[in-house]
Amino acid sequence: MANQLRERHQSLKKKYGELIDGDPSVPPEKRKQVNLAQLLGDSREKCKKMESEIKELQQRLGEVQGDNKLLRMTIAKQRLGDDEVGKRHFAPHEREDLVLQLEKAKEQIEAFEHDLQASLDELQDVKQERSFFQDKAERLNQELNHVLGGHEKRIIDIDALCMENRYLQERLKQVQEEVNLQKSNLVKYKNALEKRRNSKSNTKLSSSALTGVLSAKQVQELLSEEHGCSLPATPQSVSDLKSLATALLETIHEKNMVIQHQRQTNKILGNRVAELEKKLRTLEVSGLWSLPGGRDTITLSNPSSPSRGPKSLIPAFTDVPHHKPLTNEEHGQPGVELGSPALDEGSDNEAAKQLANSQVPLGNTYDNTYLHPFIPLLCQENEDLERQGPEIAKMTQELTAGEIEETSFEIPPDSQSTASSQENHDNLQSPFSSPEPSGAMSKKHPDISLGDENIVPVPQECADEITAGSNVNQCTEAQHDNKDCWEIEDCDSSEKAANNSCELIERCNRLNESVS
């Protein structure tokens, strides 16, 4: 048995020796290369066979899956007895997923419905609150109108009053600053007057060094070319020059204060004009007024006629029909002063009598003709101003002549600088020289802009003209009462005041013509 196995082994070794060890005729070094080439070829053939087998298996897998699907559909048809089940049939696990998705969708729908109901409830509450505040605003407007003595059917705009209140507060601050400045000037005048009374001589130049007060003639003599180089180098002349320099420095300081006040005034007026432009723009957008004609004319929309513009969002109580304007006698109220309380008694009484006896509609009450309660019309006080204009110009010219005649009075340098700045300040800041009586002019008649570019507050312009006349009369009373205060006699400033008054009168006339 062992011999047979040995023989078998030898025979197989001889038979497969060439495959294991390679060709015996090839050198041993090349046998390995031959074996590697054969192995590579064999592996490639095996890969090809395996790829073909994989393709066959994939094809069979697709066929089996199709058969499986067809079999499932056949089973479902047999169970349901419906030949058109087809696409409507789902597997059990797919059906469970669909049921879960449906339940989640129902929960989301319920949550959305709950949120929608809450939003609707909140919207209803907001609407009720809005209606409540609208009613409250209407009641407040009516009560305010009743307190201010206005018409029952013409409601006052609270927003306009708030805007006017801010404007008047700024004006009040400006007036308070001016009052403080005038008080300081008055203290300065009193000190100069006391020094002047305590001095022994009032006409000699030597007294100026002791009192620190120089007259206009003495200033001209000191600064003249003939005597400028011949001043003796004495302590008296040095003190005179020092007092003169101090007076000029105070004058410059007061001029700077006047310029600063004027800038603040211009800023306040600019803010006022901007607010009025914004309000008029909103009214124009809401269709309450328009500018179809020229640039200097205003056409207000008539609420009785149908408007072609956008519908107004203002409540219905604003639509008020036209009515006849009332006079002082029909209204039952005393005549309203248009000017400052500081006017002369004669002119003041005459103006009051004219207003009391006239049949012209009141300018400072709410009984004038209004096309809409939110748009106060231009008051008809321009006619009164036209009648009073020549009187104001005449008084201004008389004041100028009186000032020219009184140039011989001696004045302190402080009074010279302060009075000149005061007169220029009155000319520049006439709107704030005297407050309007009880704020009726500004509160009840907001400024109306004319045109697109030239925006001129007409009622304020008229008030400025009257207050300019009041300042002139104040100066006249001060000269008659206290001639020892040494008021400044500045002819140029007086002429400017007269010219400004005439220009204001002409401007009011032109504005009245354009509006009419």
UniProtKB/Swiss-Prot annotation:
Top-level taxon in the UniProt lineage: Eukaryota
Bias (Basic and acidic residues): 1-18, 321-332
Pfam families xrefs: CC149 (PF09789)
Sections of the chain in a coiled coil: 1-195, 259-286
Record keywords, A-Z: Coiled coil
Biased composition (Polar residues): 414-436
Region (Disordered): 1-29, 321-350, 406-452
Intrachain S-S bonds: none
Family, similarity comment: Belongs to the CCDC149 family.
The protein, known as: Coiled-coil domain-containing protein 149
Lineage: Eukaryota, Metazoa, Chordata, Craniata, Vertebrata
